Amino acid sequence: MIYAGTELEKCAANHTALSPVSILKRVERVHPELPAQVHGSIRRNWGEVAQRCKRLASALANHGVSSGDTVALIAPNIPEALECALAIPMLGAVLNANNVRLDAATIAYILEHGEAKALLVDTEFSSMAKEALKQSGRDILVIDIQDTQGPGGERIGALTYDELLAQGDPEFAYTLPNDEWDALALNYTSGTTGRPKGVVYSHRGAWT
């Protein structure tokens, strides 16, 4: 066969890693003015969301989060959750988004098992998160998300989400993953027959 023993090398001309991060990169360039977030009185376009994501990624990096680190999230379907889903993979870090209905003991196990380096938590769930952190024994960076459209709650973190964003760079230079099979998210099963099981999603898997 003519191609026997040969292999086409990957290069920028014939290959790019599949990743949801590339969607944000494109929409910021092509349609920055289109609406991206509608949450109560909050309205943001894709240009604004992209800048917030870059600020978040930059600020987390400044706090020591790097490629391969797990960043946990406890929040409902709010704008900050979308930003975490896009910003954390910009660093090559892994998003661990948790079901807000889980109890403290289960969250504690997930934080420990997933080796979370940071936790972003909506203050609506701060009581549960506080107990989970206590049970896990992990000393990690905690960021309070104060959802202006939600009921709110006690602050338990070192700083708020908005304070964290203020520390970030809106022009943060991020790249796509070197390998599309790199981990993007760490999800957990319900643990029906035992402890929750970790399930890793790759950049490619999340894309497809």
Name every feature range the model reports, one short phrase each.
Residues 62-63, 90-166:
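Structural core segment of the AMP-binding/adenylate-forming
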Residues 45-47, 184-208:
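Conserved AMP-binding A3 loop
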Residues 16, 33-86, 103-108, 162-163:
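Conserved AMP-binding/adenylate-forming core of the ANL superfamily
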Residues 26-32:
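Flexible acidic/glycine-rich loop/turn elements at helix↔coil and beta-strand↔loop transitions
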Residues 71, 88, 119, 183, ...:
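Conserved S/T- and glycine-rich ATP-binding loop of Class I adenylate-forming
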Residues 32, 143, 157-159, 167-188, ...:
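Conserved pre-ATP/AMP-binding loop-to-beta segment of ANL
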Residues 35, 69, 93, 181-182:
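Surface-exposed loop/turn positions
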Residues 1-17:
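Flexible, non-catalytic linker and terminal segments flanking ANL/adenylate-forming cores
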